[in-house]
Amino acid sequence: MEIALLAAARSSHTTALLPCEEDSGYAIDINFGGKTFEVVFDTGSSDLWLAEQGFKCVNVNMTSVPAANCAFGPLAPPTFQDGKIPNENFNITYGDGEFLTGFMGYENVEVAGITVDKQEVALVNYAYWEGDNITSGLMGFAYPTLTSAYKGTNPAVDNTNTTDALYTNWVFNAIDQGLISPMFSVAMERGSNGGGGQLALGGLPSISYNKTFTSTPLHIVELIPDANAAKNYSFYTILPEGYVLEGAVESFWGPQEIEVERKTDYYAIVDSGTTLMYLPPHIAEEVNALFDPPSVWIEDEGVYENDCNATPPKFAVRINGTDFYINPQDILITGEEGYDPSTGGCLVGIQPSGDGIPNIYGDTFMKNVVAVFDIGASEMRFAPHEYY
């Protein structure tokens, strides 16, 4: 269903999206306890955390390495202005394998002119992190179901014999306190165009774009092993009608072509914290096969790569009757971040899901739409934003 969305319920508070490492991620500025920090903007997780002064940096094998290896920006003071929460710690592992632990406490946090007082946040004192030397942490905008606080003081036993300490994260507190309407929207743009886009709280971005939106409901689906996610909203999960691929002939795949019980193969997370798109393996394989020349699967890396001058096929995601095409420059990552010196090839922006990775519409997709995360209506809306 297409709808003309002319105005949000309330005036919008906006802040710039700041591209990181050639658009492999996006950040926002926040005021945390009276100081400004740049943090990764992530709609695929829920916690707000900063690395603290004196933290311990480790490698993937949990061996201590110099703090510079974690590549954080400015570090936060190791205390909470509004107090530490007794017997509660922070422990999170992200989909790419990065992990962090620390403690929970309260701080006043401001984003885009909106301040939530005594927001529950984390200070990280132990981290395996592959940073960018700019961002100091991360701010998650997903549902509180995915928050990563635990009762106790020993993160080593979290997820075994400890109890989740679910809490209300920043964006949901801002909504619950009536500070913003129950929505936010994202207009992510390529940094090569001189900007990065905009995050709008409680309304729509102020940039120029096609304001005809297509809506689709959010779904409660347990895409990761989490009993809470089986009965509550967690990720911003949608069910597309399918995918359109134009090579020699037009091809279309969609969940209506398979058994109802396998529709979970098609659910997808809209996630600003993931660089690429991860799609059902047979679809990713077909997309990569129709490059000119065809992409190559690099077994050691577990990814598709191609010649950096290859021509991608036309590819679109079909959502509720509307085809959202992905700009070719987002389908093949040709900058420094996408170049593989060991093969001389470039990373493809569409990769297979599976092996614990759900279908994800990351920045490859989000740079081609304006996305409205309508929490109040339990739906998402998309407008095309392929060219700008």
How would you describe each model-predicted region?
Residues 1-21, 117-259, 347-350:
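Aspartyl protease catalytic domain
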Residues 1-25, 61-64, 70, 381-388:
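Eukaryotic N-terminal targeting leaders
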Residues 21-134, 312-314, 321:
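Signature of the N-terminal lobe/flap region of pepsin-like aspartyl proteases
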Residues 30-34, 38-41, 48-50, 138-139, ...:
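Short hydrophobic beta-strand that contains or immediately precedes a catalytic carboxylate
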Residues 43, 50-54, 59-63, 132-134, ...:
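Short, solvent-exposed loop/turn and secondary-structure capping segments
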Residues 44, 198-207, 213-217, 221, ...:
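Extracytoplasmic, non-cytosolic globular domains
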Residues 55-85, 158, 216-221, 285-301:
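Cytochrome P450 catalytic domain signature, combining two hallmark sequence patches
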Residues 126, 316-388:
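Aspartic protease catalytic domain
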